[in-house]
């Protein structure tokens, strides 16, 4: 724990001492709020989640933090850290039958449900799965992933014996049952209307929707309307002023790219219609602290209808 040493000062400088004392108070108040997986006692999951006596935990569980995650997953560390990664806790299992079957379970504490959802959707790559584990899950031979609350879980199995292959989903369900929280998706997902939305296409983007830093983070989903497959987004900004600024930055970018920006006053504010490089037509508007848009449009009409629905949904969800 850090030790704060106050510098020697004369009585005429009380403000500095008060400021440092204030920082110390904030630091100690924050300590109880830091409850990653290991600190919360959930690491016992690894010993209690065994689906049968045919598996045993190999040694102790292990843990990695943002500063050393690269030692475990190397190039993927930056991806997880970008989504708010707090801690990884994991364990290895071996078969007691001498079949050399092994299972590795890694539980990523992502800080909140939205971050865990974002990681899961990115990792599953749009695959639809019938697995019923956690809030959502996906799997193939030797691999299963799911998320629940703020946790993203990966299970990798190397199993030769047929009788053990079906035990991976059972093990995953046991892990999920012991993680805190519920199986509901993040509420931000519902900014995207369900009607005509392509199941499994929803994702949480951090680092720039359409590659634009001014649309740093938000929800994105694909829709099929009037025979067109189009994409909608809701960028979440710190304030309405920031949202207006983001729309203006986008408009400026398109104009500098040689595209025309026609005004769109149907819904929202500061709206425009233009051509997004590599993504056909785009329609965009600001509402509150959000920027909503639809792109990959061959014609504008489906985009107008969807944008109206999105902005209506945002207004219903946000407090007046």
Q: Positions of the model-derived regions?
A:
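Short Gly/Thr-rich strand-loop-strand
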Residues: 56-83, 100, 110-149, 190-215, ...
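A short acidic-to-branched-hydrophobic micro-motif
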Residues: 81-119, 153-155, 220-246
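Surface-exposed amphipathic alpha-helical segments
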Residues: 43, 159-189, 297-320
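Bacterial N-terminal signal peptides
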Residues: 20-33
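Boundary at the C-terminal end of the N-terminal hydrophobic targeting segment
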Residues: 36-41
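N-terminal secretory signal peptides that target proteins for export/translocation
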Residues: 1-16
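Structural recognition of the beta-strand scaffold that forms the well-ordered cores
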Residues: 145, 152-155, 284, 291-294
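Terminal interaction module
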Residues: 196-225, 293, 299, 314
């Amino acid at each position: 724990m850090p030790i704060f040493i106050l510098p020697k000062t004369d009585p005429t400088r009380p403000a500095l001492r008060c400021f440092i004392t204030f920082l110390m108070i904030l630091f100690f108040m924050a300590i109880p709020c830091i409850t990653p997986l290991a600190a919360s006692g959930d690491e016992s999951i690894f010993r209690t989640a065994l689906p049968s006596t045919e598996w045993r935990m190999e040694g102790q569980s292990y843990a990695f933090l943002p500063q050393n995650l690269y030692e475990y997953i190397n190039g993927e560390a930056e991806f997880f850290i970008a989504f708010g990664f707090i801690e990884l806790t994991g364990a290895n299992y071996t078969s007691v039958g001498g079949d050399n079957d092994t299972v590795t379970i890694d539980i990523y504490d992502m800080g909140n449900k939205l971050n865990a959802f974002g990681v899961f959707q990115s990792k599953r790559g749009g695959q639809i799965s019938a697995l019923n584990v956690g809030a959502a899950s996906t799997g193939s031979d030797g691999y299963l992933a799911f998320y629940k609350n703020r946790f993203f879980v990966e299970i990798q199995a190397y199993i030769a014996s047929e009788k053990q292959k079906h035990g991976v989903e059972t093990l995953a369900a046991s892990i999920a049952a012991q993680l805190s929280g519920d199986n509901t998706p993040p509420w931000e997902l519902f900014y995207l209307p369900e009607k005509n939305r392509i199941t499994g296409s929803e994702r949480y983007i951090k680092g720039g929707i359409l590659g634009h830093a001014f649309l740093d983070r938000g929800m994105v989903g694909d829709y099929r309307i009037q025979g067109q497959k189009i994409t909608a987004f809701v960028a979440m900004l710190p304030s309405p002023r920031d949202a207006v600024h983001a729309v203006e930055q986008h408009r400026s970018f398109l104009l500098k790219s040689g595209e025309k920006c026609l005004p769109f006053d149907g819904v929202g504010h500061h709206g425009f219609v233009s051509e997004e490089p590599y993504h056909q037509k785009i329609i965009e508007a600001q509402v509150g602290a959000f920027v909503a848009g639809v792109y990959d449009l061959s014609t504008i009409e489906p985009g107008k209808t969807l944008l109206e629905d999105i902005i209506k949904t945002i207004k219903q969800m946000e407090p007046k």
